[in-house]
């Protein structure tokens, strides 16, 4: 049985979140949570929240045992980009791209 959780429009770039996602892909849930707890990046906090949501979904909706679950798949897609302007010297302006991501975690008991 598979259970899915998503966080859409997460305010962090997909490139940064993929570094964390690669660390826990395919691991058992307790080990993955341990890795995320000791990682001091903002992306680790975002991924941990989505993983905990997937665990809650599996326990509540499907009645699965949380300790037996494994991260079957985790992927990060690019979300929309907010464009902002930063004033510079001599009347010019630079563009700032505030990137977002869509985090998807799938846990399975197999």
From Swiss-Prot:
Sorted UniProt keywords: Ribonucleoprotein, Ribosomal protein, RNA-binding, rRNA-binding
Entry's Gene Ontology molecular function annotations: rRNA binding; structural constituent of ribosome
One Gene Ontology CC term in the entry: cytosolic large ribosomal subunit
InterPro entries cross-referenced by the UniProt entry: Ribosomal_uL22, Ribosomal_uL22_bac/chlpt-type, Ribosomal_uL22_bac/org-type, Ribosomal_uL22_CS, Ribosomal_uL22_sf
Domain of life: Bacteria
Pfam hit, one: Ribosomal_L22
One biological process term in Gene Ontology: translation
Disulfides per UniProt: none
Complexes and interactors: Part of the 50S ribosomal subunit.
Family to which this protein belongs: Belongs to the universal ribosomal protein uL22 family.
Function according to Swiss-Prot or TrEMBL: This protein binds specifically to 23S rRNA; its binding is stimulated by other ribosomal proteins, e.g. L4, L17, and L20. It is important during the early stages of 50S assembly. It makes multiple contacts with different domains of the 23S rRNA in the assembled 50S subunit and ribosome. The globular domain of the protein is located near the polypeptide exit tunnel on the outside of the subunit, while an extended beta-hairpin is found that lines the wall of the exit tunnel in the center of the 70S ribosome.
Name under which the protein is recorded: Large ribosomal subunit protein uL22
Source organism of this protein record: Buchnera aphidicola subsp. Schizaphis graminum (strain Sg)
Taxonomic placement: Bacteria, Pseudomonadati, Pseudomonadota, Gammaproteobacteria, Enterobacterales
